[in-house]
């Protein structure tokens, strides 16, 4: 079991005056650079602590949003590749679905893999819907573009005998010959995220690490679809190292203090999706089936507890989120028991993506929660392997 400390690096003051949208069109005059600088230093201090405590590290990127100041994940990866000593560095994800230049992606990630001496984990995603307009990209056919970018990046990383040309539907290159090549051969491990059975099966066919983000007790069918796809290629059943799950985390010495921290983290979950309606679902981003489901009132934000109770993540209380395995919250013993029960439900889980900081959770609360987890929970999870 590997546990990755994660924060989206939010700018919490924006929640006090967002005017109905935290993403895309919130004026950047509401971002004070001195405050942002302090926040960046704080988040990197927490990641360095994670490295010392035995966590691995996860980073992501989003654009034009107060919910995530990581507007280019390469900056964070570069800093941590040099400053950390042992942690695996996971990017989940790199939004190659709306990136115009996969050659640059291949160069950047290869360089980071070398600087870190082989500690990079590459997670590729298509990108969230409200970032396509501000990246000047068309969401129609995004998955075709995603897979072509993916194929090009892998070819660029694994071609070592001089330049090659590329003529695709979306990308055209001459004399591709990246320097440096990756440290890990043939390339760093590949991850992606899945939220549908079809995508889960496809990732299983490719054998990539599949991350499921906060789906609670709707996760097992996705893992089972992955297993079917994985074994359809003539392989034995996949091990736990092929499966990852992202959950919120709040640990404290007492249950009451943990729940106070959990409420601060949960409020970020409830409110982080506030965005001006025209940006929420650009034409072509979702499939016909997904849009039909939305029109029929099938909410995408709902999940289930283990006993089948429906939980709406936009309004759920702390106990609902704990029961749905969206939030792991409590004393070290309670959190360990919650995670162990969820692992048992999934049939095996090798990577826990721990969102241990979000929203208004302070630096001191974050450090204390991480330290308790790192010293009292993490060793017990590793012993379960």
Label for each model-derived stretch:
Residues 3, 61, 80, 112, ...:
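Conserved, mostly hydrophobic/aromatic
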Residues 15-17, 34, 98-206, 219-224, ...:
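Internal, glycine-rich beta/alpha segment that forms the wall or movable "lid"
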Residues 26-41, 93-103, 184-194, 249-252, ...:
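Active-site mouth loops of central-metabolism enzymes
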Residues 3-7, 57-59, 89-92, 120-124, ...:
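Hydrophobic faces of well-ordered beta-strands that scaffold small-molecule active sites
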Residues 1-87, 188:
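N-terminal beta1-alpha1-beta2 module of alpha/beta enzyme domains
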Residues 38-49, 108, 194-201, 334-342:
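Short, acidic/polar
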Residues 58-76, 96, 130-133, 214-216, ...:
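Glycine-rich, proline-tolerant flexible connector loops at the mouths of alpha/beta enzymes
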Residues 4-31, 143-179, 219-346, 383-385:
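An alpha-helical appendage that flanks or caps ligand/catalytic pockets
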């Amino acid at each position: 079991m590997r546990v990755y400390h994660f924060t989206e690096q939010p700018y919490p003051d924006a929640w006090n005056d967002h005017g109905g949208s935290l993403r895309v069109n919130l004026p950047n005059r509401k971002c004070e650079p001195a405050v942002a600088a302090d926040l960046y230093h704080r988040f990197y201090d927490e990641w360095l602590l994670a490295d010392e405590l035995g966590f691995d590290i996860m980073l992501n990127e989003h654009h034009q949003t107060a919910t995530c100041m990581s507007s280019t994940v390469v900056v964070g990866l570069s800093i941590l590749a040099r400053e950390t000593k042992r942690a695996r560095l996971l990017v989940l994800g790199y939004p190659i679905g709306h990136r115009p230049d996969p050659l640059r992606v291949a160069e950047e990630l290869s360089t980071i893999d070398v600087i870190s001496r082989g500690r990079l984990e590459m997670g590729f995603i298509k990108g969230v819907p409200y970032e396509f307009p501000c990246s000047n990209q068309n969401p129609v056919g995004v998955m075709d573009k995603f897979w072509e970018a993916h194929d090009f990046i892998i070819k660029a990383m694994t071609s070592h005998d001089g330049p090659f040309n590329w003529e695709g539907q979306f990308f055209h290159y001459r004399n591709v010959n990246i320097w440096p090549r990756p440290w890990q051969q043939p390339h760093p491990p590949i991850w992606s995220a899945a939220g549908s059975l079809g995508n889960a099966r496809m990732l299983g066919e490719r054998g990539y690490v599949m991350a499921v983000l906060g789906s609670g007790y709707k996760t097992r069918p996705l893992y089972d679809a992955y297993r079917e796809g994985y074994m359809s290629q003539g392989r034995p059943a996949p091990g736990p190292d092929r499966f990852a799950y992202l959950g919120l985390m709040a640990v404290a010495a007492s249950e009451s203090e943990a729940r106070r921290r959990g409420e601060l983290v949960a409020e970020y979950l409830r409110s982080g999706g506030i965005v001006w309606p025209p940006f929420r679902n650009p034409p072509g981003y979702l499939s016909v089936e997904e849009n039909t489901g939305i029109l029929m009132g099938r909410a995408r934000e709902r999940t289930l507890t283990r006993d089948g109770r429906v939980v709406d993540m936009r309004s759920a209380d702390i106990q609902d989120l704990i029961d749905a395995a969206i939030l792991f919250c409590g004393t070290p013993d309670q959190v360990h028991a919650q995670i162990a029960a969820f692992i048992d439900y999934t049939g095996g889980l090798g990577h826990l993506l721990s969102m241990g900081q979000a929203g208004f959770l302070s630096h001191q609360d974050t450090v204390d929660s991480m330290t308790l987890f790192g010293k009292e929970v993490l060793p017990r999870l590793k012993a379960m392997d």
